[in-house]
């Protein structure tokens, strides 16, 4: 239906990403966020409360909303929306490593989730190889690079559990 809907995400950046990618009609969605992930760069980038109860209070009682722009990546015949960042190469390999290894679970149980990013970064750094890449900007300008380790687009300043990769990013 065309009725407005509110969705509250309890999770981290991956949960926000999954919800955003799964939505069909973003113009009628209000998104609430309660940060319980390991990185929480979405909330950090929007200056939302990191405390779970304060975030819940904001979701339940705030009458203010704000619109944010989402990044959109077109890859062959696929479209991927993102709220925080999107990348290929080294940074994507780190995210993939976090998803398939037990390192993130281990560090999260110790309350040291940010160290998981550092551990996976070091692990992937030794295995990183450059590749050729072509970027097509707005379907008009093509840029070719011979040795690329990674390429990232940022919608928010932070990635990787609080690393300020793109300080001037504004959603």
What is each PLM-predicted segment?
Residues 1-10, 17-25, 53-56, 64:
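ATP/NTP phosphate-donor binding region
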Residues 10, 74, 154:
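Conserved residues at the C-terminal ends of beta-strands
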Residues 10-11, 85:
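Conserved residues at beta->alpha junctions
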Residues 13-16, 35, 94, 151:
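Hydrophobic structural packing positions in well-ordered secondary structure
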Residues 14-16, 40, 157-159:
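Glycine-rich nucleotide phosphate-binding loop and flanking beta-alpha elements
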Residues 18-21, 43-44, 93, 162-163:
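Short glycine-/acidic-enriched loop or helix-start segments at secondary-structure transitions
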Residues 25-147:
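Catalytic core of DAGKc-family lipid kinases
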Residues 126, 137-141, 146-171:
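Internal anion-binding site segments
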């Amino acid at each position: 239906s065309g009725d407005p809907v509110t969705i509250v995400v309890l999770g981290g950046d991956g949960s926000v990403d999954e919800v955003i990618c799964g939505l069909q009609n973003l113009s009628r969605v209000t998104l609430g966020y309660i940060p319980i992930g390991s990185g929480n760069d979405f909330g950090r980038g929007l200056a939302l409360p990191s405390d779970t109860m304060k975030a819940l209070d904001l979701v339940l009682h705030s009458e203010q909303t704000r619109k944010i722009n989402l990044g959109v990546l077109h890859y062959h015949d696929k479209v991927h929306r993102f709220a925080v960042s999107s990348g290929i190469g080294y940074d994507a390999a780190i995210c993939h490593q976090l998803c398939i290894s037990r390192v993130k679970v281990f560090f999260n149980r110790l309350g040291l989730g940010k160290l998981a990013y550092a551990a996976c970064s070091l692990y992937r750094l030794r295995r990183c190889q450059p590749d050729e890449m072509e970027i097509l900007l707005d379907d008009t300008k093509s840029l070719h690079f011979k040795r690329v380790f990674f390429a990232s687009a940022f919608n928010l300043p932070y990635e990787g559990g609080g690393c300020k990769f793109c300080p001037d990013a504004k959603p």
